[in-house]
Amino acid sequence: MNYFPWLTTVVVFPIFAGLLLFFFPHRGNKVMRWYTICICVLELLLTTYAFCYHFELDDPLIQLMEDYKWIPFLDFYWRLGIDGLSIGPILLTGFITTLATLAAWPVTRDSRLFYFLMLAMYSGQIGSFSARDLLLFFIMWEFELIPVYLLLSMWGGKKRLYSATKFILYTAGGSIFLLMGVLGIGLYGSNEPTLNFETSANQSYPIALEILFYIGFLIAFAVKSPIIPLHTWLPDTHGEAHYSTCMLLAGILLKMGAYGLVRINMELLPHAHSIFSPWLIIVGIIQIIYAASTSSGQRNLKKRIAYSSVSHMGFIIIGIGSISDTGLNGAILQIISHGFIGAALFFLAGTSYDRIRLVYLDEMGGLAIPIPKIFTTFSILSMASLALPGMSGFVAELIVFFGIITSQKYLLMTKMVITLVMAIGIILTPIYLLSMLRQMFYGYKLFNAKNSYFFDSGPRELFVAISILIPVIGIGIYPDFVFSLSVDKVEAILSNYFAR
């Protein structure tokens, strides 16, 4: 039996280590960068060690459980634990945050605060993925918004305050519904609050009340995922934020919404999820086609990639709505896959902007010759995004397709229509991505312009791009690496489902 509080250490270490940044000398930018990167690497190694040596893959139950009475007066517990559903997002968080910190190397203004906020965000995200108490989940969910808001409002483009305000209004509005759902579930049927995930999972509710809870949680997670029509904060936010912040937003923040849908809506409220799943699939299909079509019309490079993120999140929603082993496994794989690909595309868009200082695609052109390394990595990762075989995106989308086809919930004709419409969405993806590559890298505009000498990727930027590319290709060739983490937990969720 392992008694060391691994998860508490992993959750609190980044923020407490980040507080030490404020005691560093004022002119120590380089020292602060290296310190932050070392903290992120150490945290990732610590997490990996704990999972490798203390986590059993074939056990679908919660592992590394920690349960401490935190505030006795409110009967509030510090409950942490992981299972096959949360281990993937936690490792993804560690990996992307470490690379985002390395990507933020050029940030010199208020770098002490910048790196502290990144580490605070790291703690909040791991806390959200490992919380086993509804109120603790809500606190971590909210805590993580503060550093995101400050990162958006202090570093970025000219309209950064507008986009940060829009982000906080949307997410705070969604959080009201989340809090109401948490309190409703916690206080239902007893005088004392029962906020434990395990107790709540075994609780049954009147169907009307369960639907109300489901809608509340769905709105909160739809804002974060984002699900249309609550997605409009995302393009503005990505368009203005610094690219290291965009990596965290696209790589981890959006995945928290999808994780919440599975962890709370699907696991705790199965009857309501069974009723709403056809609507989730309809919304997912509309989202894939709408966001892909809208992306094609975007002049702004980062907004085009942001809409592609919205489109790819549609596959996750369809996988969750399919109520099948294959579909849910595909959704979890897409969460991991898009975490890597989305972060990589925003990083490469940011490094391109650092050189040419242009965001509008119709002003670019001919960049392939002066910056061939960026061109090569951008092209390969765009292919991963449009689901080229051999890349993680292809496997994830294909398995979501199989999930819909093999689902027992829907009639054959319905499944054929869903598959056909999804296929149309997949055809639209290469249109906006290949068009983006053509406008940026081909042609003659910038190559023939005066003073058109640009530095290509340095070792740091190449390291970040290749570090993301390796798992994208690795998962594409051997997806069982991700499935081995989640498959038992998915079976447990769905067996509980059909048993009811």
Swiss-Prot record:
| Membrane topology, record value | Multi-pass membrane protein
EC?
7.1.1.-
InterPro entries with a match to the protein in the record: NADH_Q_OxRdtase_chain4, NADH_Q_OxRdtase_chainM/4, NADH_UbQ_OxRdtase, ND/Mrp_TM
The protein's annotated catalytic reaction(s) are:
a plastoquinone + NADH + (n+1) H(+)(in) = a plastoquinol + NAD(+) + n H(+)(out); a plastoquinone + NADPH + (n+1) H(+)(in) = a plastoquinol + NADP(+) + n H(+)(out)
**Enzyme class per UniProt:** translocase
Please, one GO biological process term? ATP synthesis coupled electron transport
Q: Single GO molecular-function term? A: NADH dehydrogenase (ubiquinone) activity
- TM annotation in the entry: 4-24, 37-57, 87-107, 113-130, 134-154, 167-187, 207-227, 242-262, 272-292, 305-325, 330-350, 364-384, 386-406, 417-437, 463-483
Listed GO cellular component terms? chloroplast thylakoid membrane
| Compartments, as annotated in UniProt | Plastid, Chloroplast thylakoid membrane
List the keywords (alphabetical).
Chloroplast, Membrane, NAD, NADP, Plastid, Plastoquinone, Quinone, Thylakoid, Translocase, Transmembrane, Transmembrane helix
Question: Which family does the record claim for this protein?
Answer: Belongs to the complex I subunit 4 family.
What is this protein's record name? NAD(P)H-quinone oxidoreductase chain 4, chloroplastic
Taxonomic lineage from the root:
Eukaryota, Viridiplantae, Streptophyta, Embryophyta, Tracheophyta
